[in-house]
């Protein structure tokens, strides 16, 4: 069974036992969370349930396996001949989730 979930403003296609990295979710390592924003779910051999915009009663249960930070990206702005330069860095905080169960009630 698979599902398309929305987490942190992005969409992810997940299967059972898959591991994904999403934007930071507060929680302890090893704790279980429920993701209620399921946009689509189904099995590969059967028709899928497509939400309008969400599938009612669908829940994805996941476990927080790691809290980490992504690689640094550099933002550099410059205006030629004006001696204007700005450099900034950013490291996004991420949460690694292991998908345990996909259910529809």
UniProtKB/Swiss-Prot annotation:
Keywords: Ribonucleoprotein, Ribosomal protein, RNA-binding, rRNA-binding. One of its GO terms (biological process) is translation. GO terms for molecular function: rRNA binding; structural constituent of ribosome. InterPro entries: bL21-like, bL21-like_sf, Ribosomal_bL21, Ribosomal_bL21_CS. GO terms for cellular component: cytoplasm; ribonucleoprotein complex; ribosome. This protein binds to 23S rRNA in the presence of protein L20. HAMAP family: Ribosomal_bL21. Part of the 50S ribosomal subunit. Contacts protein L20. This is Large ribosomal subunit protein bL21.
